[in-house]
Amino acid sequence: MRYKASTLRIIEKLKELYPEGLCSLQYEKDYELLFAVRLSAQCTDARVNLVTPALFTRFPTLEAFAAADPREVGEYIHSCGFYNGKSKDLVACAQQLLERFDGKVPDNMEDLTSLPGVGRKTANLILGDVYGQPSYVCDTHCIRITGRLGITDGSKDPVKVEQQLRKAIPPAESGPFCHRMVLFGRDVCTARSPKCEDCPLKVDCAQGKKLK
């Protein structure tokens, strides 16, 4: 498949800005990343990273999570917001991982999205970061920035954006690209008052070109 030269330049520039292109959530076990991503909904990764050390110490195994009282789990994740729903999802997810998948995090979209609290965004992240598969993680940063850049058509629908990114971004670049979108969205292309004049991508940005 042929890709737009401007998109490839954006990918390379982002590599220069953020060489690692890694998820900022901290974890040691595969299921810990799955749970951390669930906690990150409507919450910052920085806040999740403050919460998970104590959470994963209190519940050090899937079995411990599966046997946990959601109310106690909720006490550990209270500051992440929406803790009642999230705590129930973590416990139910742990139970299903043990009952249906022998304690292993699934390696395919269908099984992942069948788990409590796991949507396409979370599943894509797991497929990319855990299994090294092509993954198009369409969070708010990615949706906003790719629309501004002109890589996508500006749709706010995560599924539509994912479909467009699959055609626009080489599979091998997909996971790191989406992680870099998050970092770039925090540093430069913010939701409000983006730093367009100082943006290193403005030469290839659809909105940036309008500023000239």
What are these regions (language model features)?
Residues R2-K212:
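Catalytic cores of DNA base-excision repair glycosylases
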